[in-house]
Amino acid sequence: MTGRFDWRGQGGHTEASTKAIVFVVEDDISMRRSLTNLFRSVGLEVVAFGSAREMLQSTMPDVTSCLVLDVRLPGLSGLDYQTELARLNIHIPIIFITGHGDIPMTVRAMKGGAVDFLSKPFRDQELLDAVVAATERDRKRREAQRTVANLKSLFETLSPREQAVMKLVATGLMNKQVAAELGLAEITVKIYRGHVMKKMRARSLADLIRMSETLGISANHTEQTQV
C-alpha cells in the first residue's frame, strides 16, 4: 500500500513551536466530532479522519503526536492500519478505541505496540489520561532520537585515530593502556584524548562514557586504527 503519508514536516513546524497533535481516525461522524471537541476543550490540537486510508493519503507535520484509532473501520481496519504504519516505519503511539473488543484483539493491539485499548463507552478522563501518556512517550522518543543524532554528528567530526581513542577510553582503559593498544606514545594519547573531550563537548570521563553507551560504540582490543 502506498500513500502521501509524510512525516518530514511542513515549513515552520518545530518541536519547540508546535503543540502536540492528536490524530483521530473514527468513521462514525458523531463520535469523531465528540472526540475532536473533547480534545480541543483541553487545548489539544486535533486532526481527524474518517478512515485509515484518508490519513495515509495526508501529509502530516513531523511533531510530537499520538493516534486515537477506532478498531472497526471501513476498508483498512484499525489493527491492519497499525501493521501498515509499522511496515512504513512510522512511529506514533496508538490508543485503540472500540465498541466490539475481545481478548485476542486486545492482545494483538498491545503486542503491536499500542499504548492503550479502551472499550466504548469510556470516561473522557480515561481517554485524556491515555493521550497524555502517549504524547509524553512520543516526546521522549523524539528527544532520544535528537540526542543520538547530535552525538553522531559530533562523533563524525573526530578523526579515525580520535575515534579509536574514544572507544578505548570509554571501555575504562588508562592512557598507558590505550597507548599500548594503538602503538602510540602515552603523551600522544593524552593529546588525542583532549581533542576528543573538546570535540564531543564532554565535561568529564563519565560524560564521555555515557555518550559512548548512547552511541553504542565499542572497541576491540588490539585493534590498530590508522590515521
From Swiss-Prot:
Q: Which GO terms describe its biological process?
A: phosphorelay signal transduction system; regulation of DNA-templated transcription
Sites of the modification 4-aspartylphosphate?
70
Q: How is it modified after translation?
A: Phosphorylated by NodV.
Q: Name one Pfam family in it.
A: GerE
Main location per the UniProt record: cytoplasm
**Residue ranges annotated for the HTH luxR-type domain, each copy included:** 151-216
The Response regulatory domain sits at 21-135
Query: What is the superkingdom listed in this entry's lineage?
Result: Bacteria
**Protein location:** Cytoplasm
Q: Provide the function of this protein.
A: Member of the two-component regulatory system NodV/NodW probably involved in the regulation of the transcription of genes involved in the nodulation process.
User: What is this protein's name?
Assistant: Nodulation protein W
Q: What does the organism's lineage look like at the top?
A: Bacteria, Pseudomonadati, Pseudomonadota, Alphaproteobacteria, Hyphomicrobiales
Gene name of this polypeptide: nodW
